Regions:
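SAM-dependent transferase fold signal centered on methyltransferase-like domains
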Residues: 1-373
């Protein structure tokens, strides 16, 4: 039996054993898919977290990284790159003129493995490609039922196919573990029903699925900048009692709900003592992220205000603003919260942060407020 490769001199996790059924050719590259425009910030995060990786190909919506020699991460490797929708082991590309049998070429590259699902998605969501037809052909080639659900189950070994162009596909694989790794391309499969009042409903729906936010019926939540009420609508559906804070009008479908209250004013005009008793503070305001943090900090600085969690969308006026992300996360920790962040597939140039109360006592930030507030 040949000697095992020497341990990699890297901080990357390394698989100590190969899970049964995994591909023999595990691939020497990582492919990370992301929003168009987020590539540089994804790479910035990679340098901070995994500097041993070496950047390879760069396309709008996808970046590849070469693994160090001897490094073989676990099958479910999904580092916290924030801007990565999904992360797969890349086996390379297949390319052929239009009309050629790319499916056969893709299956040859994939090789034999205990595949349980197939994920197909376009690198460019605007591209005129039929991902469903391609997936059906790949399933047939693997002897799998064509009606197999596109979403994988945790533990499934997934064959990945990212459509770069109609003539070129990227082939790879991963083992599903996190919610996003169960969705093709890391794109949330949920749809927004016609009775929802704004896209904020869908973003919060994805956040709940991504972070497993522990909302519970009977809890109280307030939303800063609530109009027209999409997030409030989703909170109400989760069984919470909701206060929406916004001088603008709330959609009647939300405003008429018996568990909804509208404070028709700006959040900074609310007396701080009124925030006592809320379990959750939610914010998706279209303002600078520093201003969002100031609004939240003003609230958590108040004695007696200690929500169990914060769900905040941090807008990025420019992608480069994300370089301040480590400082923003430090701010949450200084408040006594443990933050998790991710750029949601249903959002735009923004990141979503779930910050849960840590349970440890911390010094309160000072808040500047007018007398009587």
């Amino acid at each position: 039996m040949p000697d095992a490769p020497p341990p990699a001199t890297t901080g990357l996790p390394r698989a100590t054993t190969t899970a049964p059924g995994a591909p023999v050719d595990r691939g020497g590259f990582i492919l990370a898919a992301c929003h168009h425009g987020a590539e540089a910030e994804l790479c910035r995060r990679q340098v901070e977290l995994l500097p041993e990786l070496r950047r390879g190909a760069w396309r709008p919506g996808a970046v590849t990284f070469r693994l160090p020699a001897g490094c073989d991460p676990p099958d479910d490797f999904f580092p916290d790159l924030v801007f990565a929708r999904t992360i797969i082991r890349s086996l390379g590309q297949v390319a052929a003129p239009a009309g050629s049998d790319l499916v056969a070429a893709a299956l040859q590259v994939a090789g034999s493995a205990a595949w349980r699902n197939v994920h197909v998605w376009p690198r460019d969501p605007r591209a005129d490609v039929d991902a469903t037809t391609i997936r059906t052909a790949l399933l047939a080639g693997l002897g799998m039922a064509p009606e197999a659900t596109p979403c994988a189950a945790p533990g499934d070994l997934v064959l990945d196919c990212m459509i770069d162009t109609p003539e070129r596909w990227w082939i790879g694989w991963h083992r599903a573990a996190t919610p996003a790794s169960c969705w093709p391309g890391g794109i949330y499969p949920g749809a927004m029903p016609a009775d929802k009042v704004s896209r904020a409903w869908l973003k919060l729906d994805e956040a709940i699925a991504t972070f497993a936010i522990p909302f519970a019926p009977g809890q109280r939540a307030c939303e800063l900048g609530a109009a027209p009420g999409g997030s409030c609508q989703r909170l109400l559906e989760a069984g919470l009692d909701v206060v929406g804070i916004d001088p603008a009008i709330i959609d009647p479908r939300v405003a008429s709900h018996p568990r909804f209250t509208h404070w028709r004013k700006r959040s900074r005009d609310v007396k701080l003592r009124e925030f006592r008793g809320f379990d959750w503070v939610v914010s998706d305001m279209n303002i600078d992220p520093v201003s969002t943090l100031e609004a939240l900090g003003r609230i958590v600085a108040e004695a007696g205000v200690r929500p169990r969690g914060i769900v905040a969308t941090l807008k990025l006026p420019a992608w480069s603003r994300a370089e301040a992300l480590p400082a923003w996360l430090t701010t949450f920790r200084e408040w006594g919260y443990v933050p998790q962040v991710r750029q949601l597939s249903t959002g735009g140039r923004e990141i979503c942060c779930l910050a849960l109360r840590s349970g440890r006592e911390v010094s309160r930030p000072r808040a500047t407020r007018r007398p009587g507030r």
